[in-house]
Amino acid sequence: MDDCIAAISSATGEAGIGIVRMTGEGCADVLDSVFKRANDKADFINRKMTYGHIVDDNEIVDEVLVCYMKAPHTYTREDVVEIYTHGGVVAVRKVLEVLLNNGARLAEAGEFTKRAFLNGRIDLSQAEAIIDMIKAKTDKAYSVSMKQLEGSVNRNIKQLRDKLLDMLSHVEYSINFTEDMQDELDNTPVLNEGKEVLDKLKKLSESANRGRIIRDGINTTIIGKPNVGKSSLLNALLKENRAIVTDIPGTTRDVIEEYIDLDGISLKINDTAGIRDTEDIVEKIGVEKSVSFISDSDLIIAIFDSSREFDDEDRKILDLIRDKKSIVLLNKIDLDGEFDVDENLEGIEVIHTSIKNNEGIEDLENKIIEMFNDGYIEANNDNIITNIRHRDIINKAIKSLESSLHDMEAGVPIDCFEVDLRNAWEILGEITGETVDDDVLNKIFSDFCIGK
């Protein structure tokens, strides 16, 4: 995998500039064949901008700046060329077409970063950190991704694998050179070190849920009957009109997703269809989807209308959020009240709101911060797992190590518990990419955009 590839690296749409990137063997030759310098200098200077034009059959395609970066000190550790074009859709597309017509191949999704991994510039956890940085919705998520790109996950896993390797060395030495294993072998040092590794693995695994929240946001679902103010709440939190607000019940028929940064905490908010009994097929599907979102939510905001009497549909909503992490809003307090709070919401903490008048919104925001800042993992914590793939691998390693330590304590023959010990060591290598198969690699890099 060293042929010349090319792709658009800048975002699609109107912009000041566009970027087309190439890497691989022969990319300088491809550039030479389509680039006409403004002066007569023959060679590109490493890491220096060169002004000129991209041409196709001597016809100018675009006025550009070109930067040629010579291997190995590049993103991919191969020769890299970046062409800075005028912004917009057409200019970058036409420049890319010229490159493809003159020897470059269109890059696959994530192929630039995949080459950086295969060429040893980054490990797999760092490659995954790059896509997390690109997708980060808050400063905190970005900071965690940056630490992982700098190698925080790699350092943690390498330290644990090194300890497991020391244990394996001790065990294998005993297998090969101890004549009477049962009488002479002392497993105590190996057992103690194994317990230390196990404890650290469990702490990493336990960090994954809060790490996921930092990375993906608090999965928050707004529920309630039609016209209680769900879409108005979304707009109030966003501080813009994203959702349609009308007096017509059932206006929201599908789930609207938006991200909000709340004092460094990211909320992924799902504005759902109003929950009620309905004969409308489309609305009914929306209601069913609303209910299904509840089970996967980290937080549920249930809204009730203080101007209406409590009814069976309200009771159904209360039942849905029972034993869930939730906040109850009693909205429309600016209207005459029909809702008996003491009778129907006894023992439930309620925030009184008039979303239309922006009353109670700050109280809601403060409540969310209070709920999720309690023991919240800070972005400068290196001992944090944000990737679900990493968590699953760590959990598999925990099972293997627990099995090995159990057999060790039970006096099982040494060559038996060595198998699970080695398995734990190999499993952890999947995080950094040292023991991962091609299918996993292809899946990870397919999540990247083309051009990264």
UniProtKB/Swiss-Prot annotation:
The protein's assembly and partners: Homodimer. Heterotetramer of two MnmE and two MnmG subunits.
Record-linked NCBIfam families: mnmE_trmE_thdF (TIGR00450), PRK05291.1-3 (NF003661), small_GTP (TIGR00231)
Residues reported in the UniProt entry to bind (6S)-5-formyl-5,6,7,8-tetrahydrofolate: 21, 82, 121, 452
Binding site for Mg(2+): 231, 252
UniProt cofactor note: Binds 1 potassium ion per subunit.
UniProt binding sites for GTP: 227-232, 246-252, 271-274
Residues that bind K(+): 227, 246, 248, 251
Subcellular localization: Cytoplasm
Major subcellular location class: cytoplasm
Gene symbol of the encoding locus: mnmE
Cofactor: K(+)
Function: Exhibits a very high intrinsic GTPase hydrolysis rate. Involved in the addition of a carboxymethylaminomethyl (cmnm) group at the wobble position (U34) of certain tRNAs, forming tRNA-cmnm(5)s(2)U34.
EC number(s) on file: 3.6.-.-
SUPFAM superfamilies (alphabetical): P-loop containing nucleoside triphosphate hydrolases, TrmE connector domain
Organism lineage string: Bacteria, Bacillati, Bacillota, Tissierellia, Tissierellales
Organism field: Finegoldia magna (strain ATCC 29328 / DSM 20472 / WAL 2508) (Peptostreptococcus magnus)
Entries under HAMAP family matching the protein: GTPase_MnmE (MF_00379)
Any GO CC annotation of this UniProt entry: cytosol
UniProt-listed InterPro entries: G_TrmE, GTP-bd, GTP-bd_TrmE_N, GTPase_MnmE, MnmE_dom2, MnmE_helical, P-loop_NTPase, Small_GTP-bd
Residue span(s) of domain TrmE-type G: 217-373
One of the record's GO molecular function terms: GTP binding
CDD domains xrefs: trmE, TrmE_N
The protein's name in its UniProt record: tRNA modification GTPase MnmE
